[in-house]
Amino acid sequence: MADDATRKAVSEIPLLKTNSGPRDKELWVQRLREEYLALIKYVENNKTADNDWFRLESNKEGTRWFGKCWYIHDLLKYEFDMEFDIPVTYPSTAPEIAIPELDGKTAKMYRGGKICLTDHFKPLWARNVPKFGLAHLMALGLGPWLAVEIPDLISKGLITHREQQGS
């Protein structure tokens, strides 16, 4: 895992109990309830720590998720749309987060803008099924990916801030 701040943030996310995916209609409702409670707690903790960095919502079934994530670099906010589907084998298989507008801009991304979490995150997820959920995906997957990739993409000139795009 990462630094002390990440460890602390993750330790404050409630662990999930229900081992169910979208195929199991009745238990899936219970799993979704746990997912939402963990996400709400994680977002509340982030806001308290002045580290608010994403918004996430789902379709009615809880199988398609979308929202925005952002990264502050040199006091400029870089904001991106994100999306992912819950795999039918969830929670055994972690979702693959896509940031479509960054597609093709980094080697740490698959076709369609799906971020690469294979080396570091997926083994951690596999060891923690079914306790890890979407809040853990954000904290241990997307958050660290943004922290590494966005400054690199900015330094290479592959992404620019909205205010700098017009000039």
From Swiss-Prot:
Pfam families: UFC1
InterPro entries according to UniProt: UBQ-conjugating_enzyme/RWD (IPR016135), Ufc1 (IPR014806)
Domain of life per record: Eukaryota
Biological process (GO), any one: reticulophagy
Keywords for this protein: Ubl conjugation pathway
GO molecular function, one term: UFM1 conjugating enzyme activity
GO cellular component: cytoplasm
Catalytic site positions: 116 (glycyl thioester intermediate)
PANTHER family: UBIQUITIN-FOLD MODIFIER-CONJUGATING ENZYME 1 (PTHR12921:SF0)
Function: E2-like enzyme which specifically catalyzes the second step in ufmylation. Accepts the ubiquitin-like modifier UFM1 from the E1 enzyme UBA5 and forms an intermediate with UFM1 via a thioester linkage. Ufmylation is involved in various processes, such as ribosome recycling, response to DNA damage, interferon response or reticulophagy (also called ER-phagy).
Subunit structure comment from the entry: Interacts with UBA5 (via C-terminus). Interacts with UFL1. Interacts with UFM1.
Sequence similarity: Belongs to the ubiquitin-conjugating enzyme family. UFC1 subfamily.
Name of the protein described by the UniProt record: Ubiquitin-fold modifier-conjugating enzyme 1
Naturally occurring in which organism (per UniProt): Salmo salar
